[in-house]
Amino acid sequence: MRIDKFTTAFQTALADAQSLAVGRDHQFIEPAHVMKVLLEQTQGTVAPLLEQSKVNLSRLIDGVNKAIDSYPQVEGTGGEVHVSRELSKILTLMDKFAQQNKDQYISSEWFIPAALEAKGQLRDVLIEAGADKKAIEKNIMNLRKGERVTEQSAEDQRQALAKYTIDLTEKAETGKLDPVIGRDEEIRRTVQVLQRRTKNNPVLIGEPGVGKTAIVEGLAQRIVNGEVPEGLKQKRLLALDMGALIAGAKFRGEFEERLKAVLKDIAKEEGRVILFIDELHTMVGAGKAEGAMDAGNMLKPALARGELHCVGATTLDEYRKYIEKDAALERRFQKVLVEEPSTEDAIAILRGLKERYEVHHGVEITDPAIIAAATLSQRYITDRNLPDKAIDLIDEAASQIRMEMDSKPVELDRLERRLIQLKIEREALKKETDEASKKRLSDLETEIKNVEKEYSDLEEVWKSEKASLHGTQQIKEELEQARIELEAAGRAGDLARMSELQYGIIPELDKKLKAASQKEEQFHDHKLLRSRVTEEEVAEVVSKWTHIPVSKMLEGEREKLLHMETELHKRVIGQDEAVNAVANAIRRSRAGLSDPNRPVGSFLFLGPTGVGKTELCKALAVFLFDTEDAMVRIDMSEFMEKHSVARLIGAPPGYVGYEEGGYLTEAIRRRPYSVILLDEIEKAHNDVFNVLLQVLDDGRLTDGQGRTVDFRNTVIVMTSNLGSDLIREFSGENYDKMKDAVMEVVAQHFRPEFINRIDEAVVFHSLKKEQIRNIAIIQIDRIKKRLKEKDYQLTISDDALDYLSELGYDPVYGARPLKRVLQQQLENPLSQKILEGKFVPGSLINIEKKGEQLEFKEA
């Protein structure tokens, strides 16, 4: 018999049976070897066929294994095996059955009827497992659906829908899909398009994370519950698995063959199947090779003829990039736009999903946590969309609590380490014989007993808490399962089971859950374990994602912002008008009175050099974000040429450096919450101001690659020396008079539309002598801090402080000369004395004024 008459799948089975016989040292390939291999084929037709024919597969596998074990083992054959007489007879019968059915190739399923007709060991095993020849032949006809085997790869194309699609309606029936809340308008629109006579293929278009796939899952649930028009009832919604379709398609045309088989099976279903293609743009160009047709082109005829009922989903960008380019494909789909839900809708969606996440993580999710997830994600995570980002927050916060519950509490861990430490000490003291050691040993024994008792008590509490939490999780899982069963019973019309569940099992589980929750409440005061996701946990996750200190977000807004001036004045001496202006802008923003679509605040700081313009920015960054790193500093003197604008926002397409992005836009994309300092703004080219106009007005900027960067959470500060000579001139005059004079100079330099967009222009005063003295105290405190790290202490007398302040005072240059004076008069001589060894670590250094210089003494 010619081996090439068999299908590819059966040829593979024969080869595997041969290697099985060789591995077991058998002389012949027996039918049992082939049977074992056919049953183990992952995508074979024999196992499903036997299952449909009510054959007991586990009994059959046992029988086949026993038969293989009974064959004699022959050594010294050199791996040479032959087809046994029994197998040869079965193969001949398979050929006969194939010819009777007018098949061109012999397929695997004929092996079973042939084995049952040929009298042999395998026939007895099959009959014992419950095989019936007539039932199997009938199921073969059902499997083939009147088709003949005309290709060697025919078996691979069978049951294409089962292999290459995922049944969403089946998932909905078994309760494996998450509930879909809201989105009624989009689902109704999708159903409306599906009901059309032609072009009945909706494509859901929306930003990533707005819930396009969820809408299709919602449709599957509605089909299952019968909440759809008559035309859609009893239909199956299948999701095309592109990965399975492409995976393993090694040869040219194999991918097209598989897709053709899927389309053929769908056509046979005669409209009873709706195909869902997620990431629809992947179909355009999939399987494309030189001279070959891609998947998108293969779909067109089926879509045009109405054989294929299809729902697609893709993002706006990908739709434009791939589908709109192919006008013939685009016209076959009807667009359904999916907008991002509002915060209120997102809260409703989260409330609907809450139970699923509680069961999965085994924690309780509070309602304030849900509200916090929606509001905080909308406010702070601007580059993603609701409800996806809010769901992620809840999911991560719940997994964090679960992780804490599963690991040992910090308090227990600390006691355990302490116990180990004490026991090591006890072992060391046992070797000592002096009285002090013996006394310490007896004290140690008492301490060990106390710590052991404390540890065991705490461990007991921890175990009981853990057990109570585990109890509620188990009850919640049972309750969810009971509800899924109730829905299934309702669909099946099983009234007895429905009443048993609704009036017996579910109320009983509710009662158990209530009791377990009350027991859990008893532990709530002295918790070792957190079992609830509150707004605090959600805020913690937000801070991990966005680097905003969580305490700052949860601290009462009033308390935090009312003492803002005091905090800023710890670093910035004088300049009350500037500090108040900044504080008021931040307060307006946080109280929700300022425009949410503009930056938190935009300021123009004007004043002479060294008066604290840049220092105020640093103080603001520390106050708002706890770190100076949150300040993006750009020296505008570097942007004096017209073309340097590209450095801020990125080079346009076609230019070198296009992929790299801009300095300003990239910094804010990575850290959207920062203080932006544009130093020496008057030195920049005029075109740079044009770029800043939309940042100051709309809080947004489009970079070289067309991405919108969000500046709404930034504080923008620009500094300038314009009019500094006037500030010195008007130093004794009224502040408003001085400001008006300076603003006249500013108006001559900057365009009106630029000045008009700034929240406030603040004029800094020249520093007075007493302010320089206060700055000297701050600077010396920093030196003390650095010395403390090296284990030195420093004190300075008032005389010495006055002397340094006097030397450092310069009305023209501000506080910078003071820094130089401290360097020359204090840091230089002190570092020399430390290196000479006059002061050793641990010493207290006292600085006093002696004549016209400072004296350093060890106190």
UniProtKB/Swiss-Prot annotation:
One Pfam assignment: ClpB_D2-small
NCBIfam families: chaperone_ClpB, PRK10865.1
Family as reported in the entry's similarity comment: Belongs to the ClpA/ClpB family.
GO process terms (BP): cellular response to heat; protein refolding
Region (Repeat 2): 83-146
SUPFAM superfamilies cross-referenced by the UniProt entry: Double Clp-N motif, P-loop containing nucleoside triphosphate hydrolases
Ranges for region NBD2: 557-766
Name of the protein in question: Chaperone protein ClpB
Main subcellular location of this protein, as a coarse class: cytoplasm
Complex and partners: Homohexamer. The oligomerization is ATP-dependent.
Cellular localization per UniProt: Cytoplasm
Region (NBD1): 159-340
Gene Ontology cellular component annotations, sorted alphabetically: cytoplasm
MF term (GO), any: ATP hydrolysis activity
Annotated function: Part of a stress-induced multi-chaperone system, it is involved in the recovery of the cell from heat-induced damage, in cooperation with DnaK, DnaJ and GrpE. Acts before DnaK, in the processing of protein aggregates. Protein binding stimulates the ATPase activity; ATP hydrolysis unfolds the denatured protein aggregates, which probably helps expose new hydrophobic binding sites on the surface of ClpB-bound aggregates, contributing to the solubilization and refolding of denatured protein aggregates by DnaK.
Region (C-terminal): 767-859
Sorted UniProt keywords: ATP-binding, Chaperone, Coiled coil, Cytoplasm, Nucleotide-binding, Repeat, Stress response
Binding site for ATP 2: G607, P608, T609, G610, V611, G612, K613, T614
